[in-house]
Amino acid sequence: MNLVNRQLVRVITATLASLATLSTMAANAIEEPAYTVARAWESEQIEIRRYAPRVMAVTTMQGSDGDGFRVLAGYIFGGNATEQKIAMTAPVQQSMAGEAEMAFMMPAEYALKDLPTPDDERVGFKEAPAYTAAVIQFSGWASANRADEHWQRLRQFLIAEQIDIAGQPTLNQYNPPWTLPFLRRNEIIVPIALSEAILSGSAGGR
């Protein structure tokens, strides 16, 4: 490798390292939903989590994923009755079955009654109660095919573990668009019926 190529490699490596650091710093600064891990299978990247209640801003997606994101982003960036700016949180949640819906979690400081009225009638709200869910994590780009592949993995795992699925899966994406693929954090999450057998490890065969 000649000198020019070596210098180019150093520049690219330094740039990637800088982007990785910025992506990590940005991710660490964003509020995420509160939960506790009830059980984990680290080799499978699967967890059973107990989530606290939270308020979600939601919209039905009529076109692309980006359309839903822009509608919700418009609301938190001041498109509301008081022109109030609301902090961005993670993850951005997207339904994988039934009606095509996207949701932003509202910061924990907000109760439903505290949120300003949206300017855009396509923005609505949901109060999500406390619930238990199974979660599988993966990195890279969360294309429809990759999301479905990981959902099928999670579903088959839950069947093998004799864990009852109690709702529809959603895709959770935690990172801004410029995050490098290998640093991206994605999850498929599905509500389950929690039992003492699951917590003790006596359900299923693993």
Segments (PLM) and residue ranges:
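A solvent-exposed interaction/effector surface
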Residues: 2-206
